[in-house]
Regions:
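Generic hydrophobic-segment detector
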Residues: 3, 7-9, 14, 198, ...
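Transmembrane helix recognition focused on a "late"/terminal membrane span
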Residues: 1-9, 27, 31-120
């Protein structure tokens, strides 16, 4: 039996490849060494200058574009981080292989054996490499750039290339709390965003589940007709529906005030002659937005829930009937738990989606009416406030990036807690 020293193999791997060569995996060792040589050449020729520019963000206005330097630096930083992960994996690999050799476990030595081992044991990982590469540059890279911008002074007074950007640390985050204008705006917008996400999402979920339960009842005739009707809000493009309903809620000539309310006034006399300020009063605008999202969002929940209901065995309901359970007890103990067990991730995603539902806020009333300071309208949510911060006459890109990071932290934290509490991905008990 061979006697390898794992600590010696790990120590030799400080120069990638040497530990593998020590373990008599020469093919792997030379590949690791080759990767390192290529990286060193790349780092000296390309990455090092760009990372230096990332730190300084330029020193001569007009010639140096700080924003481009930041983006290019972030791009090369990804490759450096990937190599660092490879570097430490190389040390761990040498140490692990040495221990396996000492334990008499066969290890691939030749290039042919290594390829065979990768094909037999690592083929699934090879298939997902393109996905990881795409995710890195489509998701992680923009996130890194946004994160970096949040720590700069990128605004209308510092627009590259005529002006240089500077690193300002946590200034943008502290300004949200220290500057009265931004503090009041952030508090108002955040509170409305939370109310909006909870109210609108809950409404569309309740309507969707309710209509699905009704449509699934055996005594309902013409189920296909009901299905088509319930899917209409989903079939029409959302932006068309939003613009149409926005016109219907017009204070003076909208169909709601001129036609619907007079009809309701015959049943509800207190509505006689009422003209509700849907578009000019923030409270009524918020109510209209919540109702509209309930209408737009429930068809998806309806389709999802209907499929779940049709998969629930009738034996459960028959047993509950024999035990004397009423309709509410059947729903609470059978129907709702089954819906929640299957659809919990989707239901949670409705809340996260509405937390960032920009289109309805922008198309319905442009975030108005009125303003709460800091460039935010009275019905702006965080994502639409970010839009205002970046497209206004005095854009605040770094502040918008800071708010974006705050949104991300809130959404990710709440989603992870909800997934964990609801055991959203635990399907063993379904």
């Amino acid at each position: 039996m061979e006697n390898q020293q794992p600590s010696k193999a790990a120590l030799l791997s400080v120069i990638p490849g040497l530990g593998q060569i020590y373990n008599k995996q020469k093919a792997k060792g030379f590949i690791f060494l080759g990767v390192t040589i290529v990286f060193v050449l790349y780092f000296l020729a390309l990455a090092a200058p760009e990372l230096h520019n990332l730190i300084t963000l330029g020193d001569k206005p007009g010639r140096d574009n700080s924003l481009f330097m930041l983006i290019r630096g972030a791009f090369h930083l990804i490759f450096v981080v990937v190599y660092v992960l490879f570097y430490f994996s190389n040390i761990k690999d040498a140490h692990t292989i040495a221990k396996r050799i000492n334990n008499g476990i066969p290890v691939p030595r030749t290039f042919k054996d290594m390829i065979k081992g990768i094909y037999e044991n690592g083929f699934p990982y090879l298939l997902i490499i393109p996905s990881y590469v795409a995710m890195t540059f489509a998701i992680i890279f923009p996130v890194i750039v946004t994160l970096m911008i949040a720590f700069t002074n990128y605004d209308f007074q510092h627009l590259p290339p005529n002006k240089l950007l500077d690193w300002v640390g946590l200034t943008n985050f502290t300004n949200i709390w220290s500057l009265s204008t931004f503090r009041s705006a952030f508090g108002a917008v955040l509170s409305w965003t939370i109310i909006w996400a909870l109210s609108a999402s809950t409404l569309q979920i309740v309507i969707g589940i309710f209509t699905a339960i009704i449509a699934n009842q055996p005594f309902i005739k013409g189920k296909r007709i009901f299905g088509v009707i319930f899917l209409l809000p989903w079939a029409v493009p959302a932006f068309i529906t939003i613009l149409t309903i926005s016109n219907m809620f017009n204070d003076s000539v909208g169909a709601i005030n001129t036609q619907v309310l007079p009809i309701l006034a015959k049943v509800l006399p207190f509505l006689d002659g009422a003209l509700i300020p849907w578009k000019t009063d923030p409270t009524w605008t918020k109510i209209a937005l919540i109702m509209m999202q309930g209408w737009l969002g429930f068809p998806y929940i309806y389709v999802l829930t209907l499929g779940i209901l049709q998969s629930i065995p009738n034996d459960l309901y028959e047993a509950a009937y024999i035990d004397g359970a009423n309709a509410w007890q059947k729903f609470r103990n059978i129907t709702f738990p089954m819906i929640l067990a299957v659809a919990a991730p989707t239901l949670i995603s409705q809340y996260t989606f509405n937390f960032n539902n920009f289109s309805i806020m922008y198309l319905f009333n442009g975030g108005g009416p009125g303003s709460v300071g800091g460039g935010a309208g009275s019905t702006d949510i965080l994502i639409s406030w970010i839009y205002r911060l970046t497209t206004g006459t005095s854009p605040q890109y770094s502040m918008a990036a800071a708010v974006t990071l705050i949104i991300s932290i809130i959404v990710i934290s709440i989603s992870m807690i909800a997934f964990k509490k609801l055991h959203a991905f635990d399907m063993e008990d379904v």
